[in-house]
């Protein structure tokens, strides 16, 4: 992509709820390699705009262009499959499962026997993949030591938030939305 290319453009986004106009002609442009912060008072529509992008809410009006195509994600799975990940304000975790299970839930690496994937999860591959994501995020450099086999409920909220960020990164997305994750 060239410097002036746009990765995400949201134009004229409107969203209303009963008795409330949450978004009125919202605009956002994001170029590759940039970091943006949406700031405003509580109730200003920041999370609503991001939930319209991520397929949680359907917009009432407006256009979303992502990676050169007009899009309207119908679900968070649709957004993830197309390169958009989101870390939500509210943690959505399986607290009785391990860190690595939470990161790879629904995407577990499978054991291959004779070239065919079996219905068994490869614990070693899941562990190694989790450690690779942690390495990509420089967790060790920042003194963040999380054992992938740790049960989520035993960790403080700050570490559980880091797991959510690692999960978003694990999708290799082109855009990661952090909706007040820290």
What positions do the PLM features span?
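Glycine-rich phosphate-binding loops of nucleotide-dependent enzymes
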Residues: 1-182
């Amino acid at each position: 992509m060239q410097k002036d290319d746009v990765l995400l453009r949201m134009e004229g986004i409107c969203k209303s709820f009963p008795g409330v106009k949450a978004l009125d002609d919202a605009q956002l442009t994001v170029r590759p390699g940039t970091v943006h912060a949406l700031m405003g008072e509580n109730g200003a529509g920041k999370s609503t705009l991001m939930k319209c992008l991520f397929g949680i809410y359907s917009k009432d009006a407006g256009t979303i262009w992502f990676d050169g195509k007009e899009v309207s994600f119908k679900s968070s799975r649709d957004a993830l499959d197309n390169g958009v990940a989101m870390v939500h304000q509210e943690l959505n975790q399986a607290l009785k499962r391990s860190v690595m299970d939470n990161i790879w839930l629904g995407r577990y690496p499978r054991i291959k026997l004779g070239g065919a994937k079996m219905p068994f999860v490869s614990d070693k591959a899941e562990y190694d993949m989790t450690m690779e994501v942690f390495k990509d995020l420089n967790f060790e450099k920042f003194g963040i030591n999380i054992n992938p086999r740790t049960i989520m409920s035993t960790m403080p909220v700050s570490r559980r938030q880091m797991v959510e960020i690692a999960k978003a990164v694990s999708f290799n997305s082109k855009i990661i939305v952090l909706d007040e994750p820290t």
